[in-house]
Amino acid sequence: PGGSDIFENVTFEAEKGNIIGVTGSVACGKSTLGKVFLCEYPYEGSIKVEGNELAELDDTKKAGLVGYLGHDPELFNDTVKNNIQLGDNADTTKFLKAVCFDEEVNEMENGQETLVGNTGVRLSGGQAQRLALARTLCHKKPLIILDDPFSALDKDTEKQVFANLKEYTKDCVVILISHRLYLFPEMDKVIWMENGKTVAGTHDEIMNRCPQYAVLYNEQRGGASDEE
């Protein structure tokens, strides 16, 4: 109320196992779109997850339907294992393997019992992202929002983690927000955002309909432009 729309006409449907890629021009609101699914911003229209209108649910029910992981994740001052399990008795090794972090953890002096966070071993950006993603997969929800989850990963690691992500989320819908586009041909759908407008379709359809997307994709082909 009293403000202007950040974007409009966002329309798409997704089935379990779908990964939806979201990207756009600078400051287009793609991260805001991710947080709309957390109801952190008001919206007009309808957002339904498993038949539930998100705006009508209490926080507990929303938390049971939607998971969110940002590009700068928070780690707890606890062990690697506890950061993943969060009190559950899950097989943490398989989730560390899924995010290609198991070998690095095994090389730590105390393995999965290594303390991380502000009071423990200082992890690199890529390590922290992968540990947080392992936690997200361990406690996956029907809808998972990933906001630039691979921004600190090299190309080869990102490719492998993405391949594993597809296997682990066959019973979920994933919305993956990113400015790195070389994996977007593998997305089930792509949403391009620019000047408050959105266009949804397959990668090939967006390449044909949105010249700026095609320019960015071709510039980044091979993943070299954003590799760290």
Segments the model singles out, each with a brief description of its role:
Residues 43, 102-131, 140, 146-149, ...:
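ABC-fold ATPase nucleotide-binding domain signature/coupling loops
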Residues 13-14, 61:
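Conserved hydrophobic segment flanking the Walker A/P-loop of ABC-type ATPase nucleotide-binding domains
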Residues 163, 167-170, 185-228:
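C-terminal portion of ABC ATPase nucleotide-binding domains
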Residues 23-25:
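The feature captures the beta-strand-to-loop junction immediately N-terminal to the Walker
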Residues 73-115, 140, 156-157, 212-215:
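Conserved "ABC signature" C-loop
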Residues 37-39:
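Helix-to-loop junction immediately C-terminal to a conserved catalytic motif
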Residues 45-53, 62:
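Conserved ABC transporter NBD signature motif
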